[in-house]
Swiss-Prot record:
This is DNA-directed RNA polymerase RPB5 homolog. It is found in: Host cytoplasm; Virion. Part of the viral DNA-directed RNA polymerase that consists of 8 polII-like subunits (RPB1, RPB2, RPB3, RPB5, RPB6, RPB7, RPB9, RPB10), a capping enzyme and a termination factor. It comes from African swine fever virus (isolate Pig/Kenya/KEN-50/1950). Pfam families: RNA_pol_Rpb5_C (PF01191).
Length: 205
Protein backbone atom coordinates (compact mmCIF):
# COMPACT_ATOMS: atom_id res chain seq x y z
CA UNK A 1 0.00 0.00 0.00
CA UNK A 2 2.83 2.42 0.84
CA UNK A 3 4.44 1.85 -2.56
CA UNK A 4 1.17 2.47 -4.39
CA UNK A 5 0.74 5.77 -2.54
CA UNK A 6 4.37 6.71 -3.08
CA UNK A 7 4.03 6.08 -6.80
CA UNK A 8 0.94 8.29 -6.97
CA UNK A 9 2.04 11.16 -4.80
CA UNK A 10 5.71 11.47 -5.74
CA UNK A 11 4.63 12.55 -9.20
CA UNK A 12 2.14 15.00 -7.65
CA UNK A 13 5.00 16.32 -5.52
CA UNK A 14 7.14 16.89 -8.62
CA UNK A 15 4.26 18.70 -10.31
CA UNK A 16 3.58 20.80 -7.20
CA UNK A 17 7.23 21.87 -7.11
CA UNK A 18 6.82 22.95 -10.77
CA UNK A 19 9.49 20.53 -11.92
CA UNK A 20 9.51 18.92 -15.36
CA UNK A 21 10.13 15.19 -15.74
CA UNK A 22 13.19 14.34 -17.82
CA UNK A 23 11.94 10.83 -18.59
CA UNK A 24 8.53 9.43 -19.38
CA UNK A 25 6.52 8.30 -16.37
CA UNK A 26 6.69 4.53 -16.00
CA UNK A 27 3.71 2.29 -15.15
CA UNK A 28 3.25 1.20 -11.55
CA UNK A 29 4.24 -2.42 -12.15
CA UNK A 30 7.61 -1.36 -13.58
CA UNK A 31 8.13 0.98 -10.62
CA UNK A 32 7.62 -1.92 -8.20
CA UNK A 33 9.74 -4.26 -10.30
CA UNK A 34 12.68 -1.86 -10.32
CA UNK A 35 12.55 -1.36 -6.55
CA UNK A 36 12.36 -5.12 -6.02
CA UNK A 37 15.12 -5.98 -8.50
CA UNK A 38 17.58 -3.11 -8.04
CA UNK A 39 16.69 -1.77 -4.59
CA UNK A 40 15.66 1.69 -5.75
CA UNK A 41 13.70 3.69 -8.30
CA UNK A 42 15.01 6.99 -9.65
CA UNK A 43 13.16 9.96 -11.11
CA UNK A 44 15.03 12.85 -12.74
CA UNK A 45 13.39 16.24 -13.11
CA UNK A 46 14.36 19.80 -13.99
CA UNK A 47 13.53 22.90 -11.95
CA UNK A 48 12.49 26.30 -13.26
CA UNK A 49 16.13 27.36 -12.78
CA UNK A 50 17.24 24.46 -15.02
CA UNK A 51 18.80 22.62 -12.11
CA UNK A 52 18.48 18.85 -11.93
CA UNK A 53 16.65 17.12 -9.09
CA UNK A 54 16.99 13.36 -8.69
CA UNK A 55 14.53 11.51 -6.48
CA UNK A 56 15.62 8.08 -5.23
CA UNK A 57 12.94 5.85 -3.69
CA UNK A 58 14.59 2.95 -1.87
CA UNK A 59 13.06 -0.40 -1.05
CA UNK A 60 12.82 -1.13 2.66
CA UNK A 61 14.98 -4.26 2.43
CA UNK A 62 17.35 -3.41 -0.41
CA UNK A 63 21.12 -3.43 -0.11
CA UNK A 64 21.46 0.36 -0.41
CA UNK A 65 19.70 1.07 2.88
CA UNK A 66 21.55 -1.64 4.80
CA UNK A 67 25.09 -1.46 3.42
CA UNK A 68 26.77 1.90 3.67
CA UNK A 69 29.29 1.12 0.96
CA UNK A 70 26.58 0.49 -1.62
CA UNK A 71 24.80 3.73 -0.73
CA UNK A 72 28.07 5.67 -0.91
CA UNK A 73 28.87 4.24 -4.35
CA UNK A 74 25.39 4.96 -5.68
CA UNK A 75 25.38 8.60 -4.55
CA UNK A 76 28.98 9.22 -5.59
CA UNK A 77 28.31 7.85 -9.07
CA UNK A 78 25.14 9.92 -9.38
CA UNK A 79 26.89 13.11 -8.33
CA UNK A 80 29.77 12.41 -10.71
CA UNK A 81 27.45 12.39 -13.72
CA UNK A 82 28.40 16.05 -14.24
CA UNK A 83 24.79 17.14 -14.33
CA UNK A 84 23.86 20.53 -12.94
CA UNK A 85 22.49 19.01 -9.77
CA UNK A 86 20.40 21.19 -7.52
CA UNK A 87 19.02 18.57 -5.18
CA UNK A 88 19.02 14.86 -4.36
CA UNK A 89 15.95 13.60 -2.53
CA UNK A 90 16.31 10.19 -0.89
CA UNK A 91 13.09 8.52 0.27
CA UNK A 92 13.35 5.58 2.66
CA UNK A 93 11.36 3.50 5.11
CA UNK A 94 11.28 5.37 8.43
CA UNK A 95 13.48 2.92 10.42
CA UNK A 96 16.35 3.65 8.00
CA UNK A 97 16.51 7.18 9.43
CA UNK A 98 17.89 5.63 12.61
CA UNK A 99 20.78 3.84 10.88
CA UNK A 100 24.01 5.68 11.68
CA UNK A 101 25.97 4.20 8.78
CA UNK A 102 23.47 5.57 6.25
CA UNK A 103 23.16 8.97 7.92
CA UNK A 104 26.95 9.28 8.10
CA UNK A 105 27.09 8.85 4.33
CA UNK A 106 24.52 11.62 3.85
CA UNK A 107 26.69 13.94 5.98
CA UNK A 108 29.77 12.87 4.02
CA UNK A 109 28.12 13.52 0.65
CA UNK A 110 26.85 16.93 1.76
CA UNK A 111 30.37 17.92 2.77
CA UNK A 112 31.80 16.69 -0.54
CA UNK A 113 29.07 18.41 -2.60
CA UNK A 114 28.30 21.72 -0.86
CA UNK A 115 26.41 23.17 -3.84
CA UNK A 116 23.92 20.28 -3.93
CA UNK A 117 21.05 19.97 -1.46
CA UNK A 118 20.93 16.36 -0.26
CA UNK A 119 17.98 15.37 1.90
CA UNK A 120 16.63 12.07 3.20
CA UNK A 121 12.96 11.66 4.12
CA UNK A 122 10.61 8.88 5.27
CA UNK A 123 8.00 7.35 2.98
CA UNK A 124 5.07 8.92 4.79
CA UNK A 125 5.94 12.47 3.66
CA UNK A 126 5.05 11.37 0.15
CA UNK A 127 2.15 9.00 0.86
CA UNK A 128 -0.31 11.89 0.82
CA UNK A 129 -0.61 15.18 -1.03
CA UNK A 130 0.34 17.48 1.86
CA UNK A 131 -0.89 20.77 0.29
CA UNK A 132 -4.35 19.25 -0.21
CA UNK A 133 -4.81 18.22 3.43
CA UNK A 134 -7.54 20.53 4.75
CA UNK A 135 -6.27 20.32 8.34
CA UNK A 136 -2.90 21.80 7.34
CA UNK A 137 -2.87 25.62 6.99
CA UNK A 138 -1.77 27.04 3.67
CA UNK A 139 2.00 27.51 3.48
CA UNK A 140 3.73 29.70 0.91
CA UNK A 141 7.37 30.62 0.44
CA UNK A 142 8.00 34.35 0.28
CA UNK A 143 10.97 36.10 -1.26
CA UNK A 144 13.84 37.50 0.76
CA UNK A 145 12.68 40.98 -0.29
CA UNK A 146 9.17 40.33 1.04
CA UNK A 147 10.60 38.91 4.26
CA UNK A 148 12.93 41.87 4.79
CA UNK A 149 10.07 44.30 4.18
CA UNK A 150 8.00 42.50 6.82
CA UNK A 151 10.89 42.44 9.29
CA UNK A 152 11.50 46.14 8.71
CA UNK A 153 7.86 47.05 9.34
CA UNK A 154 7.79 45.02 12.54
CA UNK A 155 11.30 46.04 13.71
CA UNK A 156 12.34 42.39 13.89
CA UNK A 157 15.34 40.25 13.03
CA UNK A 158 15.00 36.75 11.51
CA UNK A 159 15.96 35.17 14.84
CA UNK A 160 13.00 36.95 16.46
CA UNK A 161 10.54 34.94 14.38
CA UNK A 162 9.18 31.56 15.36
CA UNK A 163 11.00 28.83 13.49
CA UNK A 164 9.94 25.94 11.31
CA UNK A 165 12.18 23.02 10.33
CA UNK A 166 13.20 22.38 6.73
CA UNK A 167 11.90 18.83 7.31
CA UNK A 168 8.38 20.01 8.19
CA UNK A 169 6.08 18.33 5.62
CA UNK A 170 4.64 21.51 4.03
CA UNK A 171 8.16 22.98 3.79
CA UNK A 172 9.46 19.82 2.12
CA UNK A 173 6.69 19.97 -0.46
CA UNK A 174 7.42 23.65 -1.10
CA UNK A 175 11.15 23.06 -1.44
CA UNK A 176 11.98 25.48 1.37
CA UNK A 177 15.60 25.70 2.49
CA UNK A 178 17.22 26.90 5.73
CA UNK A 179 17.29 30.69 5.65
CA UNK A 180 14.06 30.93 3.64
CA UNK A 181 10.82 32.35 4.99
CA UNK A 182 7.38 30.78 4.82
CA UNK A 183 4.04 32.51 5.19
CA UNK A 184 1.33 30.50 6.93
CA UNK A 185 -2.36 31.38 6.77
CA UNK A 186 -4.25 30.14 9.80
CA UNK A 187 -8.01 30.39 10.43
CA UNK A 188 -8.86 33.27 12.76
CA UNK A 189 -11.92 34.10 14.85
CA UNK A 190 -11.52 37.83 14.16
CA UNK A 191 -10.51 37.68 10.52
CA UNK A 192 -10.78 35.24 7.63
CA UNK A 193 -7.10 34.36 7.98
CA UNK A 194 -4.31 35.20 10.40
CA UNK A 195 -1.02 35.42 8.53
CA UNK A 196 2.21 34.51 10.29
CA UNK A 197 5.79 34.38 9.01
CA UNK A 198 8.17 31.60 10.03
CA UNK A 199 11.94 31.34 9.54
CA UNK A 200 13.10 28.01 8.10
CA UNK A 201 15.91 26.32 10.01
CA UNK A 202 18.10 23.32 9.30
CA UNK A 203 16.52 19.92 9.93
CA UNK A 204 18.03 17.50 12.43
CA UNK A 205 18.82 14.93 9.73
Amino acid sequence: MAMQKLFTYIYEFIEYRKMVLLEEKVPYDKFVQMIFNTGFFRINAETLNHGIVSVFIFGANGKYVHHGGDMRTLLTNALNEKKQYEELILIVDKPILGKKNILDIIVEQRAANPTVVINIYPYHLFCINIPKVSAIPRHKLITQEEAQAFLGREYLQPQDLMQISASDPPVVWLGGRPGDFVQIERPSETAMHAVVIRYITKSKI
